[in-house]
C-alpha cells in the first residue's frame, strides 16, 4: 500500500511515493539510533548513583560524600570514571573503519545485523559486571556495536528514502537517538529507587532490549537498491526492489542514475585513498567538520553528565535524574519537530537558527553559574531551575539543528563510490571527539568552572559561521545528483575545478 506524492527535485525528477514498506524498513533500521541513544543516556545516570559509585569508583564516592574541601566543580573529576563513559567511543572509532569494508562489500544490512548482535552481548556483560574491568570491557563491546550501526544506518535511511522525504526519514535516526536517551533516563530514575543497591544492573542490562529488536528485525530488512547495484550486475533484481521501495513500476530514470553511479564506484579500488582527490574535497571537509562541530556544541556533556551537572549545582540524586528526563523529553520533541520541517525550511536555516539559540542559552547558563555557584555550597533552588530551563532551551536548539542534521547532511552528500568510506570518516570523527569531550569534560569543569559554557558557546559561533558561508542547501536533491550543489556553490566550485566537471560530463554521456 503506497501513499504520497510524486518525487521531484531541483536536481531531476524521479517517480515514486512514500510507501509503507519504506516506512517500516526505516523504522526498524532506526533502532540503531535507539541503542546509541540509550547508551549515551544510561552512563550519566548510573554514574550519579551512589551504589554504582561505591562498587566501582569508591574514590569518587568518598570525594563526593566526605571531602568538604573539594570544589563543587571537581567532585567527579576521575579519569577512571570518564574512561567508563568514553571507552565506548574509542572502540566505536576503530570499528567504524572495519564497518566500512563490510558495508561496501556485503551491504548495509549485514553491518546493521552485526552491530545489533555485538551490542546485545555487551549489554549482558555490563549488567552482570562484578569489577571495573568487566564493566569497561562491556562498554568496549557496546562501542563496536554502535560503530557498525552508526556507519550503516544513516546510509540505509538516505538510500531508501525518496528525495522529497529524505530529510524527515534520516532525521528519524536522531529522533531514535533521543528516544533511546529518554528511555535510559526514565529507567535510571526508576532503578535508582530500588532497595539493595542493584538498580544500576537493570539500567545497564536493559540496553539489550533495543539491541535484540534491532538484531531480530535486521534479519528481515531489505537491502537498498543502491547497494544491490553496487555489489552485483543483477540490475533486474535491483529494479524490482526499487519498484517496491518507490511504489511504482516507472523507476527507470532513478535506476539509470544508480547504474551510472555504480559504474564509477567499481573503478574505485581504494575509496579511502580516492576520497582525498580534489573533486571530493567539499565532501571530505564536511565529513570532518560537521561531526567535529556536532561534538563541540557540548551536547554530549549534557547527555553524559547531566545528572552529575545537576548535582554539582545543588540538586539531589533523584532530582538530578528527573531533570535529565525533562531535558530528554525536550530533545526528543524538538527532533520530532525537525523531522516535520527540515524538508520545507531546508538544512541551512535549521543549522543557523539552532546555533543562535544554543549560543544564547550557553552564555546565560555560564553567567548564572559564574555569579551564583562558588567552589563550596550550592546555589538557590530558584537559580538551579533557571539553569535547568536554559539547558532545555539549549537542548531544543540542538534537537532541531545539529543533532539530526549532523547525521543527515553527511549521509546524503557522498557519491556512491566513496559513500561507505565517507560515512566511516564521519562516524570516526564523531567518536574521536566524543571521546575527547567525554574524557576531558570533568577535568575541564574542574579547571574552567563556569567558563566551560563560554568555551562551547565560542565553538557554536564558529560552526554557525561555517554553515552560513560553506554549506550549500541539499534539500530535495536526489542523492545520486548531489554533485550539482558543489558545482554551483560560490566557493567549492573553485576548489573542485575542472576535474569534477569533466568526469561528470563523461558520466552523463555514458
UniProtKB/Swiss-Prot annotation:
Stored Gene3D superfamilies: MFS general substrate transporter like domains (1.20.1250.20)
Pfam hit, one: Sugar_tr
Family per record: Belongs to the major facilitator superfamily. Sugar transporter (TC 2.A.1.1) family.
SUPFAM superfamilies linked to this entry: MFS general substrate transporter
Localization in the cell: Membrane
A single GO cellular-component term on record: membrane
Keyword Lyase: no
Originating organism: Ricinus communis (Castor bean)
PROSITE patterns: MFS (PS50850), SUGAR_TRANSPORT_1 (PS00216), SUGAR_TRANSPORT_2 (PS00217)
InterPro entries in the cross-refs: MFS_dom (IPR020846), MFS_STP/MST-like_plant (IPR044778), MFS_sugar_transport-like (IPR005828), MFS_trans_sf (IPR036259), STP/PLT_plant (IPR045262), Sugar/inositol_transpt (IPR003663), Sugar_transporter_CS (IPR005829)
UniProt membrane topology term: Multi-pass membrane protein
Predominant place of localization: membrane
Keyword Transmembrane helix: yes
Membrane-crossing residue ranges in chain numbering: 23-43, 83-103, 118-128, 140-160, 169-189, 202-222, 284-304, 325-345, 349-369, 382-402, 428-448, 451-471
Superkingdom to which the source organism belongs: Eukaryota
NCBIfam families for the chain: SP
One Gene Ontology MF term: symporter activity
Protein name: Hexose carrier protein HEX6
